Amino acid sequence: MDLKNFDISAGETGVELTILDLDNKPTDIKIKVLSFHGKKGREVFMNAVKENKGAEQSTLEVMVGLTVGWSGISENGKELKFSPDEAKRIYETYPLIANQVERFAENARNFLKK
């Protein structure tokens, strides 16, 4: 088997995730996420572990650290610009979005180089 089948280098710059609604249909929300398995992902994870804030807070910090941008997110008719603080607030407020980001970042297949 060719080792290129294990190349998840796309996770170092980020891959776009389309958020699904409650009916599993794609929305306009796109979140650019780094791979949990990449160099930056491991670095973000180790920093969260060192801070020892507890499992839930550490998971939140990792997700925020792996999120590098987005589009299509609005709240009360106002477009939200990406920032780590805003990502943290969204993930705390909207767990359905947070869960999709967490699952996506953990799945190495999402970051295979095409």
Task: Give a label for each model feature.
Residues 13-24:
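Short acidic-hydrophobic surface loop/beta-edge motif
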Residues 1-12:
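Short, intrinsically disordered N-terminal pre-domain segments
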Residues 4, 18-20, 58:
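Exposed, low-complexity/repetitive linear segments and helix-based recognition motifs
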